[in-house]
From Swiss-Prot:
Gene Ontology biological process: ribosomal small subunit biogenesis; rRNA processing
Domains: entry comment: The PRC barrel domain binds ribosomal protein uS19.
Key word Transit peptide present: no
Subunit-structure text: Binds ribosomal protein uS19.
UniProt name for this protein: Ribosome maturation factor RimM
Organism: Legionella pneumophila (strain Corby)
Length: 169
């Protein structure tokens, strides 16, 4: 159960909030409050995923804050700061064919239709209008994630994304 490959990071704990053991939650879900859909939170601590029991979680205008069982005070909950929040991959909703969670694209190789290797996807950057693949290789490439326009094919089995993009961009 603690095999790291079965886990998806959905957020990260921030700093303590107030004096009663609340902690800020930085959600990696889109929209941010989708993190509330997952009940079975775990934290990677002491080289393994450990379950957390949420006592309270609140969405405020500028933050999500949570109170975790076993962390009743500011000093105790500060130990969670900067730790990742994970859920088992099986908790994620099934996607339609051709749709992907961003974590599935991270680490894939990127080539163009000529077979030129750009590098690997290291990050996906939201820009407002469309997301952008950040590809690191001999140089850094920023490629708009627009399936059918710039993203031609995603081969999950080979872990390769084919793009219509020039190496000189």
């Amino acid at each position: 159960m603690n095999n790291k490959t079965n886990w998806v990071i959905i957020g990260r704990f921030g700093r303590p909030h107030g004096i009663k053991g609340f902690v800020t939650v930085h959600s990696f879900t889109d929209p941010a409050d989708n993190i509330l859909r997952y009940n079975d939170w775990h934290v990677f601590l002491n080289k393994q995923w450990q379950p957390l029991k949420l006592l309270t979680i609140e969405v405020r205008s500028k933050a999500i804050i949570a109170q975790i069982e076993g962390y009743p005070e500011r000093e105790l909950v500060s130990a969670l700061t900067n730790l990742d929040i994970g859920v088992q991959e099986s908790q994620l909703a099934a996607l339609a064919p051709g749709e992907y969670y961003w974590y599935q694209l991270i680490g894939m190789s990127v080539i163009n239709s000529k077979g030129d290797l750009f590098g690997k996807v290291v990050e996906i950057m939201p820009t407002g209008s469309n997301d952008v693949l950040v590809v690191e290789g001999e140089k850094r490439h920023l490629i708009p994630y627009l399936p059918g326009q710039f993203v031609i094919n995603i081969d999950e089995s080979q872990q390769v994304i084919t793009v219509d993009w020039d190496m000189n961009f």
